[in-house]
Amino acid sequence: MGDMANNSVAYSGVKNSLKEANHDGDFGITLAELRALMELRSTDALRKIQESYGDVYGICTKLKTSPNEGLSGNPADLERREAVFGKNFIPPKKPKTFLQLVWEALQDVTLIILEIAAIVSLGLSFYQPPEGDNALCGEVSVGEEEGEGETGWIEGAAILLSVVCVVLVTAFNDWSKEKQFRGLQSRIEQEQKFTVIRGGQVIQIPVADITVGDIAQVKYGDLLPADGILIQGNDLKIDESSLTGESDHVKKSLDKDPLLLSGTHVMEGSGRMVVTAVGVNSQTGIIFTLLGAGGEEEEKKDEKKKEKKNKKQDGAIENRNKAKAQDGAAMEMQPLKSEEGGDGDEKDKKKANLPKKEKSVLQGKLTKLAVQIGKAGLLMSAITVIILVLYFVIDTFWVQKRPWLAECTPIYIQYFVKFFIIGVTVLVVAVPEGLPLAVTISLAYSVKKMMKDNNLVRHLDACETMGNATAICSDKTGTLTMNRMTVVQAYINEKHYKKVPEPEAIPPNILSYLVTGISVNCAYTSKILPPEKEGGLPRHVGNKTECALLGFLLDLKRDYQDVRNEIPEEALYKVYTFNSVRKSMSTVLKNSDGSFRIFSKGASEIILKKCFKILSANGEAKVFRPRDRDDIVKTVIEPMASEGLRTICLAFRDFPAGEPEPEWDNENDVVTGLTCIAVVGIEDPVRPEVPEAIKKCQRAGITVRMVTGDNINTARAIATKCGILHPGEDFLCLEGKDFNRRIRNEKGEIEQERIDKIWPKLRVLARSSPTDKHTLVKGIIDSTVSEQRQVVAVTGDGTNDGPALKKADVGFAMGIAGTDVAKEASDIILTDDNFTSIVKAVMWGRNVYDSISKFLQFQLTVNVVAVIVAFTGACITQDSPLKAVQMLWVNLIMDTLASLALATEPPTESLLLRKPYGRNKPLISRTMMKNILGHAFYQLVVVFTLLFAGEKFFDIDSGRNAPLHAPPSEHYTIVFNTFVLMQLFNEINARKIHGERNVFEGIFNNAIFCTIVLGTFVVQIIIVQFGGKPFSCSELSIEQWLWSIFLGMGTLLWGQLISTIPTSRLKFLKEAGHGTQKEEIPEEELAEDVEEIDHAERELRRGQILWFRGLNRIQTQIRVVNAFRSSLYEGLEKPESRSSIHNFMTHPEFRIEDSEPLIPLIDDTDAEDDAPTKRNSSPPPSPNKNNNAVDSGIHLTIEMNKSATSSSPGSPLHSLETSL
């Protein structure tokens, strides 16, 4: 009975302990004793408490705290406790220094190759062959004027200097983003609060301020912030799997197992505990420190302690370590604010055991694209070097028949080094260094801005995944409605009151039952407080439905607090707390005569079925038959529900003193044979902005579904008010039990085919359990009923919503009403619990994708042109027209700036005027491909014209076939300058990727873009006019500058011409991808595929969607590339482990599998809107079409599970993980 009989106790000596604590720093129990006690489990712990301290109140006395009043809150006392018992904080690892980040940036293989080549070039440039031998070395050394040989070192030095610049820029980016992340992290941590009792007042304090001796209130959904011992509990069940590996919920009670451990989840019930260990001394903290999260000193110190403990309590530690290996969730202690945690092994275990996302949509596609670009670049650079070396060797030793002289060897080697540098230049050009940075910047920028739109992003990839969302499964309460509940109708003493009745109209005994039942059978943490501002609304604290009932008592001019003062929470004999399965709450009171009375409240149809009597008009109980119940349902409950009211039934039952005491653990026998007191109708108004937000979603091709625990009539009424349902539409509204009946076969197994028949038309799922929600979400995601497979976002607030939130592509948790467990399972937290914030998330998600596409269009144009120019130029003229240092400026510096410029475009409402991208849409739409090839054609024509005819046009010396270490030529400077200016003006073109004509639209709204374009132009002037030998530049005249600018601006005019050409006419673009039928794609690749987005298309045909299909079949090639890419980025920082769920902005992680997902990179479908006017206009106004998932324009052929994948430092987006 001890777990039920939470009766008041005379706390001898405890009440005075508050005063003692302020004067005496010596506690009656040491830190070591508390740690040893918390190591024990269940009966061992209970025995130790009884033997050493008597009971939990004895521990409270020794800790100088009151079980009822808590700590005094005196600052001196709190400081003393922190000094003795520690702070609720795990010191994070020191952030990497700037020099460490510089060293890591230097590990890039491309840069290492350039460094080696530059050093060799530098060393050889100082060698001069004997004068007499110069002629014998052939033409290779002819043409060097006096003194020019001495400047040969400049090129090598300039390359080294460029590498230093690149490294510093990279390191600074990483450093600033890590700093930004830590700032955001600390801000999030400051917002984490927990409820404690101090000075007799229930207050919320930051988790870090909790100290030993605090009396903490725990409730359903909490993640425990510290270790403690239960003082009083109501039906308390804890999920300890994070520490023990046991999946069953553990029932906690004073007489069986009173220990509560940090990092565990409260799955049911409520209670109070005295905090006994915090921070590194708590059970989760000990594990953190053993893993090194607390720093090296802590680790060494705790390793010694661990060894000692192993001898004494080997079993306990072994058990915990085994549990840790089984379930990495031990690392998820929310309140312990470790920003980095765990060594690599534990991190890998955690990832292996905690299902989270695979590669996100964008990451998957960019990974594949980077692999293919890397392959092409490697091939082109190798061919370039081979051709140059062969040409030189054949020309020198075969055609000119020169002998190989030992004295000439250094000169020959210089040539080979020069060829090698040209080859590396081609590789540098081909590898899109700016791409990971563009993703990082775009996501970081979006995440920062989304916080202002009430979206707190925990997983960065969720930000862009929202751009793909085709379906949103939303809760009703608080998300679509205001969560400001009030009782507006009631059925009492056989009368249906359309407004709250006067207390005089209710018989006194019914009023008494009503007041006592509501006061004690609502959580004592639910209360109504006076308004913060004069004239404002009273504040509702705790469960909003219970607050509505308490407000109902206040409307009846009765004060619930008087009843609670008379019957404190400790006097409650037994509480059956509310959960999603029972959908009711019951409280048992023991009367002085030995009799019991139970009060119940819950969903009206559930409680009414358990009622055998009802209080009549005169206040007497009369028999309540099934037909009477049916009458009430038809005349009272259904009319209330059809007005959108939530109906709650209140009832009671007496257990006379003479009868045997019931078996309290058998709830079904206890909560039955009730007497109905009243049925109340609670109004929760729809948020005024929600109907418009839902209309925007439907216009954007997103289907909104309501999943709620309310009855079907209430749900249907609210759905109609919101605009989810429209009169006359053929859509389904189902209750959970009906839904389950339809989707299961005779054996009770769920069948996907059955779900597929329901979900396309389903709009409302009422009376649903969290399991139903998970089943629906999984069913929609896994469905292949149409090619347009779904990307699903889900909102959730309850502990049991965790599975659905994790299964969804994007899980939204409620910041206000959500439990810690729901927040932990989510990807994004809605800080205002408002549906309109989800719409903003969709807008930001689409904007991220657009930003990356813009940069991709710009980057690929630069890459195509530069690779062809470097390759062709090198093969024809024996030298690259664009020198290594110039290419470093173009590719590493300018692209970095361009990624910043294009990735920070603010979103516009027009993003919501088109359908979602979908999972399998190609990354490069045909419009983008048209722009890339069109602009590349213009730029190549200009560059090659200047290269082979420029000297005649400008009447200057030709720069072609210049000897080694020749001075910079005006000719090649004009080529370089024109090339850069064409990229600069093409950056403006790249702002639009849908074929819009006005590329300047909104340009001044983006100050970053304007600043960067102007800044790049200024730097280009400095490089050309003053760069000299290091940049291989010669000063240009005003005329030459004007011609360069004119040719650069030509890209804007050329862009208008390209926009005029209808994409649908360019059939040859189709040849870029070979059609692969759906059935040809191997199942395992289907399972790994990820979402695709393309802006240019409305639909995607089944065939002809895959590019480089052959590459996917050659597994060994991909392994080679993986190895190459791993080495390419091996020096980059490993991502911080998600050791604490405080790390809300944890990093997106992915790896490149041997079996690459089949993702089309080039779109080759015909359906395309070429005119910007079409593209920006809203789709056809058919509500069915807008609101039907089948027409949402998504083509999906794969499953994307939210499961963790280990991070690969070789991934091209790895910088994303390391820098945020």
From Swiss-Prot:
Its EC number is 7.2.2.10. The keyword Nucleotide-binding applies. Isoform B is ubiquitously expressed. Isoforms A and E have only been found in brain cortex. Isoform C is found in brain cortex, skeletal muscle and heart muscle. Isoform D has only been found in fetal skeletal muscle. Isoform K has been found in small intestine and liver. Isoform B is expressed in hair cells of inner ear. Residues 312-325, 337-356 have a biased composition (Basic and acidic residues). Residues 1118-1220 are annotated as: Required for basolateral membrane targeting. Residues 1200-1220 have a biased composition (Polar residues). The chain crosses the membrane at residues 106-126, 155-175, 367-386, 419-439, 856-876, 883-903, 928-948, 972-991, 1006-1027, 1040-1060. Mg(2+) binds at D475, T477, D797. It catalyses: Ca(2+)(in) + ATP + H2O = Ca(2+)(out) + ADP + phosphate + H(+). The keyword Acetylation applies. Residues 1100-1117 are annotated as: Calmodulin-binding subdomain A. The active site is at D475. GO terms for biological process: calcium ion export; calcium ion export across plasma membrane; cellular response to corticosterone stimulus; cellular response to vitamin D; intracellular calcium ion homeostasis; negative regulation of cytokine production; negative regulation of cytosolic calcium ion concentration; neural retina development. The modification N-acetylglycine is found at G2. It is a multi-pass membrane protein. It is an enzyme of class 7 (translocase). The modification Phosphothreonine is found at T1116, T1165. Residues 2-105, 176-366, 440-855, 904-927, 992-1005, 1061-1220 are cytoplasmic. GO terms for cellular component: apical part of cell; apical plasma membrane; basolateral plasma membrane; cytoplasmic side of plasma membrane; dendrite membrane; dendritic spine membrane; GABA-ergic synapse; glutamatergic synapse. Catalyzes the hydrolysis of ATP coupled with the transport of calcium from the cytoplasm to the extracellular space thereby maintaining intracellular calcium homeostasis. Plays a role in blood pressure regulation through regulation of intracellular calcium concentration and nitric oxide production leading to regulation of vascular smooth muscle cells vasoconstriction. Positively regulates bone mineralization through absorption of calcium from the intestine. Belongs to the cation transport ATPase (P-type) (TC 3.A.3) family. Type IIB subfamily. Monomer. Dimer. Oligomer. Calmodulin binding. Interacts with PDZD11. Interacts with SLC35G1 and STIM1. Interacts with YWHAE; interacts with the monomeric and dimeric forms of the YWHAE but prefer the monomer form; this interaction inhibits calcium-transporting ATPase activity. Interacts with NPTN; this interaction stabilizes ATP2B1 and increases ATPase activity; this interaction controls T cell calcium homeostasis following T cell activation. Interacts with EPB41; regulates small intestinal calcium absorption through regulation of membrane expression of ATP2B1. This is Plasma membrane calcium-transporting ATPase 1. It comes from Rattus norvegicus (Rat).
